[in-house]
């Protein structure tokens, strides 16, 4: 699944590559997929996108906003798979779930490997969409300060019991983060995924906050994770410290063997000595 660093990369590349191109034809999926969420029929999507120009893209959390001007915004979110630019539309993949063919002969395609939203809104209405409307600050927002982070933890603790992994990956409490990047955040913060959020002292809260910022910045600076591809089909440069290849290997910090556990619906890789 794309997380914040990959979407920041895709937005930047879209602005370098797509801005100003005029849509000749808009197409929805050529292969049915019950977990792709559309809000337009095939006919509506084609009619409303034809003749519109690509504007400046932006991202928030795990959502990508691509203006089709005048008047509309293409919203892609909560998905993994690929978003690819094709210099010629003769190179379109065999399967796609959305395509924009441009007047200059190039194209953009989106394909999801799991699930995702591919929706077209009248400009401004995309901000009313569920999961976008009430989105909290993300780690790249100026409002994501340590003061805000402390308040977020205190707010979360008034509800159900949470763990550190739960804070990072559940209910988009910190938009843009997912299970992949959370592994390295917890390693940098020296915290076990099951660590009770209520038990964090001030020093641990600070360490977790700083680990979020450091990990997200590192992944953005390197164009996203190396197990995801960018707009041009190239893998990102960020190699995770804690992923499936780390299991059974020595911890890079203390040499203890890295272990794998299943927790909160996904695999976790951790150092049983460093992360408590």
Q: At which residue positions do the language-model features occur?
A:
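Basic, nucleic-acid-binding surfaces and adjacent catalytic neighborhoods in DNA/RNA-processing proteins
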Residues: 22-44, 58, 152-276
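A generic structural signal for well-ordered coil/turn residues at beta-strand boundaries
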Residues: 60-62, 94-96, 131, 247, ...
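Low-complexity, intrinsically disordered regions enriched in charged/polar residues
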Residues: 1-4, 39, 129, 143, ...
């Amino acid at each position: 699944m794309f997380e914040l660093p990959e979407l920041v990369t895709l937005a930047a590349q879209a602005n370098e590559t797509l801005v100003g191109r005029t849509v000749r034809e808009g197409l929805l999926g050529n292969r049915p997929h019950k977990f792709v969420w559309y809000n337009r029929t095939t006919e509506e999507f084609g009619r409303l996108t034809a003749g519109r120009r690509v504007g400046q893209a932006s991202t928030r959390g795990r959502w990508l906003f691509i203006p089709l001007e005048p008047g509309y915004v293409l919203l892609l979110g909560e998905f993994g798979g690929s978003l690819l630019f094709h210099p010629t539309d003769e190179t379109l993949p065999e399967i796609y779930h959305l395509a924009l063919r441009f007047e200059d002969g190039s194209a953009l395609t989106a394909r999801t490997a799991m699930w995702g939203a591919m929706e077209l809104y009248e400009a401004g209405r995309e901000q009313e969409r569920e999961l976008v409307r009430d989105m909290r600050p993300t780690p790249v927002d100026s409002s994501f300060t340590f003061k805000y982070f402390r308040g977020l933890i205190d707010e979360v603790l008034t509800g159900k019991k949470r763990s550190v992994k739960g804070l990072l990956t559940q209910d988009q409490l910190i938009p843009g983060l997912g299970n992949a990047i959370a592994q390295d955040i917890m390693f940098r913060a020296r915290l076990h995924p099951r660590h009770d959020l209520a038990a964090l002292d001030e020093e641990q809260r600070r360490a977790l906050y700083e680990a979020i910022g450091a990990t997200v910045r590192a992944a953005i600076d390197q164009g996203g994770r190396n197990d995801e591809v960018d707009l041009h089909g190239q893998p990102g440069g960020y190699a995770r410290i804690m992923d499936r290849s780390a299991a059974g290997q020595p911890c890079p910090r203390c040499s203890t063997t890295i272990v794998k556990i299943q927790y909160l619906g996904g695999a976790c890789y951790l150092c049983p000595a460093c992360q408590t």
